[in-house]
Amino acid sequence: MLKKDMNIADYDPQLFAAIEDETRRQEEHIELIASENYTSPRVIEAQGTQLTNKYAEGYPGKRYYGGCEHVDIVEELAISRAKELFGATYANVQPHSGSQANAAVFMALLEGGDTVLGMSLAHGGHLTHGSHVSFSGKLYNAVQYGIDESTGKIDYAEVERLAVEHKPKMIIAGFSAYSGIVDWGKFREIADKVGAYLFVDMAHVAGLVAAGIYPNPLPHAHVVTTTTHKTLAGPRGGLILSAIDDEAIYKKLNSAVFPGGQGGPLMHVIAAKAVAFKEALDPEFTTYQEQVVVNAKAMARTFIERGYDVVSGGTDNHLFLLDLISKDMTGKDADAALGNANITVNKNSVPNDPRSPFVTSGLRIGSPAITRRGFGEQESVLLTNWMCDVLDDISDLAVSERVKAQVLELCAKFPVYG
């Protein structure tokens, strides 16, 4: 018999302790992983509802199970809000993740073995953009473009040259570690030149796009995907969008999600997406995203002032790459040193990195989470100087302990959930 007063703490103290420890870590550590953020209590509430009990294979009004009249409303709310948020005429809110959303696009628009042109993982792309270890590189003929080493920006001339040479059926624009502004229109121009679909993965900048401070790819791309966490600050999940008014493609996309790649949707997560989309439509969300960019720019500028190399020389969005090659330091060691001071980052390859992806020569740094907990430009500069203090000599334990104490004090002033 199920009872409302059942809880994890009493039944499974070992698991509860791990959850409590992670909660404490999030409050006492500064989060700078560019793909992480803090969801609102409303999003967390939605994910903890009884919607998790409901199977709802199919789409609103066309389910394979009975009893879906209420979850239909939930999904329709999420769909309509996603369309409004991004100016789309089509939205599929069912993908469990960004990678699964991307896989659905491949399945809908391509045949196995077709040629795709995407950004190299080593230059800031994503696994699903054609990496040889991903389905996108195993099942398809993947050609990769990169950035111009002299500018740190996407080399559009190379993109066009490769497109003309290889005649891809689909060109992929988007990134997981690129600090510039992507020219979606230029990508569409190249795609049209060779008769290719343009598929944009805006997972990292979706929140900035929603706020109108990063170019919207919807007017240019045939299909757009995103995650619903990262800068959108919603639950972990995926989303597929389009604005081309092509019902045939919309039908293919729906079929590629269900039954092509997934079974029943996660209705509790879709409810959380609906909440997050509503939050993103609020005016204060734009203010938040503007501060995200201000903070990232301030951090990149401060690193440069302290003698560190920033790929592309700065940032125009929420993230940037710190190149540590000139410091003779690995990303792995830098990551660990900052972690010891309660500052969480992730090691990351830099363009033409001589080290393996398990070691790397760089760090990826993002501002969405620190901005979410209330950091402004002043705190961002202060934090960056602390990070430089640690990185100037990662063997100096006294500096590490001093910075850790400063981090704890700052975190106490800016609780995640105050």
Curated annotation (Swiss-Prot):
Domain of life: Bacteria
Keywords noted in UniProt: Amino-acid biosynthesis, Cytoplasm, One-carbon metabolism, Pyridoxal phosphate, Transferase
Gene Ontology MF terms: glycine hydroxymethyltransferase activity; pyridoxal phosphate binding
Cofactor field: pyridoxal 5'-phosphate
Binding site for (6S)-5,6,7,8-tetrahydrofolate: L121, G125, H126, L127, S356, P357, F358
Compartment(s) where it occurs, according to its Swiss-Prot or TrEMBL record: Cytoplasm
The keyword Flavoprotein is annotated on this UniProt entry: no
Functional pathway: One-carbon metabolism; tetrahydrofolate interconversion; Amino-acid biosynthesis; glycine biosynthesis; glycine from L-serine: step 1/1
PTM annotation (N6-(pyridoxal phosphate)lysine): residues: K230
Catalytic activity: (6R)-5,10-methylene-5,6,7,8-tetrahydrofolate + glycine + H2O = (6S)-5,6,7,8-tetrahydrofolate + L-serine
Pfam families: SHMT
GO terms, biological process: glycine biosynthetic process from serine; tetrahydrofolate interconversion
Record-annotated site: Plays an important role in substrate specificity: H229
Entry's EC annotation: 2.1.2.1
Predominant location: cytoplasm
This protein's GO CC annotations: cytosol
InterPro entries given in the database record: PyrdxlP-dep_Trfase, PyrdxlP-dep_Trfase_major, PyrdxlP-dep_Trfase_small, Ser_HO-MeTrfase, Ser_HO-MeTrfase-like, Ser_HO-MeTrfase_PLP_BS, SHMT-like_dom
PROSITE patterns tied to this protein: SHMT (PS00096)
Protein function: Catalyzes the reversible interconversion of serine and glycine with tetrahydrofolate (THF) serving as the one-carbon carrier. This reaction serves as the major source of one-carbon groups required for the biosynthesis of purines, thymidylate, methionine, and other important biomolecules. Also exhibits THF-independent aldolase activity toward beta-hydroxyamino acids, producing glycine and aldehydes, via a retro-aldol mechanism.
Assembly mode: Homodimer.
Family note: Belongs to the SHMT family.
HAMAP family hit by this protein: SHMT
PANTHER family, alphabetized: SERINE HYDROXYMETHYLTRANSFERASE
Protein name per UniProt: Serine hydroxymethyltransferase
